[in-house]
């Protein structure tokens, strides 16, 4: 958030607008300014909040690889995969954070071609950049299928805690963004170094917060 002040400011504006009564921006509101409750946060749709969360997860590549075992003999893009083979799917390389590799479409199965029509692909010009707007449709609605994202795996063996993660992120990001401004850090503290194991975690997590005191703005 601190590294992307424009996205942070837009998110705060849209959260304040969405929770206008709670934050005291409604002229006829009888209550004093306060942070929204958990129920209010979960019941209020803020497409740009969803976009920020999804883009943060995409760029964080928390789980760099997903493993699957072939239960039957099969073929992947023309390559024979015997039953019992462990297949590792990288979720932080081409198509995710790098431009997609060229693939002969005739090698894809009908199911793969159909799935490709459902999911979008990322613009190779900015696939490595933090661009929350990539998750929004032209009408401003959130599009969870805008492009590939596999931080939680996929299919019936995907992460069973996925829904809880999104709920927690929606609550925490909303409250922190409404209450505080994330200020820029010195270069020595503003790093993206990670500790790598089966998942990735930040080596350090420094923040510089400033309370938000000016709640009045024009959308």
Tell me what each language-model feature is.
Residues 4-62, 82-85:
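Cytochrome P450 I-helix active-site segment
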Residues 5-8, 162-200:
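Cytochrome P450 heme-binding "Cys pocket" and the immediately downstream C-terminal segment
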Residues 27-30, 139-151:
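Active-site-adjacent bridging/hinge elements
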Residues 56, 81, 130, 155, ...:
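Hydrophobic, well-ordered secondary-structure elements that form the walls
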Residues 75-80, 86, 148-176:
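C-terminal, well-structured subdomains that either form a transmembrane helix-short loop-helix hairpin
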Residues 83-84, 90, 95-98, 158, ...:
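Eukaryotic short linear interaction motifs
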Residues 89-140:
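Conserved cytochrome P450 K-helix/beta-meander segment immediately N-terminal to the heme-binding cysteine loop
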Residues 200-219:
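C-terminal helix/juxtamembrane-tail motif
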């Amino acid at each position: 958030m601190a590294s992307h002040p424009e996205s942070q400011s837009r998110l705060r504006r849209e959260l304040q607008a969405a929770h206008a009564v709670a934050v005291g921006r409604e002229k006829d509101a009888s209550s004093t300014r306060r942070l929204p409750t958990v129920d209010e946060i979960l019941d209020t749709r803020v497409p740009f909040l969803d976009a920020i969360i999804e883009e943060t997860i995409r760029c964080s590549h928390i789980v760099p690889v997903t493993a699957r075992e072939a239960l039957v003999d099969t073929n992947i893009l023309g390559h024979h995969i015997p039953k019992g083979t462990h297949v590792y799917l990288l979720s932080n390389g081409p198509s995710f954070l790098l431009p997609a590799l060229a693939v002969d479409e005739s090698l894809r199965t009908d199911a793969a071609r159909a799935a490709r029509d459902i999911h979008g692909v990322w613009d190779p010009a900015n696939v490595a950049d933090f661009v929350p707007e990539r998750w929004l449709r032209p009408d401003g609605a959130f599009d969870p299928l805008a492009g590939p994202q596999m931080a939680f795996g996929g299919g019936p063996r995907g992460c069973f805690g996925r829904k809880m993660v999104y709920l927690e992120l929606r609550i925490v990001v909303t409250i922190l963004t409404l209450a505080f401004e994330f200020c820029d850090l010195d270069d020595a503290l503003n790093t993206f170094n990670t500790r790598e194991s089966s998942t990735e975690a930040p080596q350090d997590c420094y923040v510089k917060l400033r309370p938000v005191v000016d709640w009045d703005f024009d959308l």
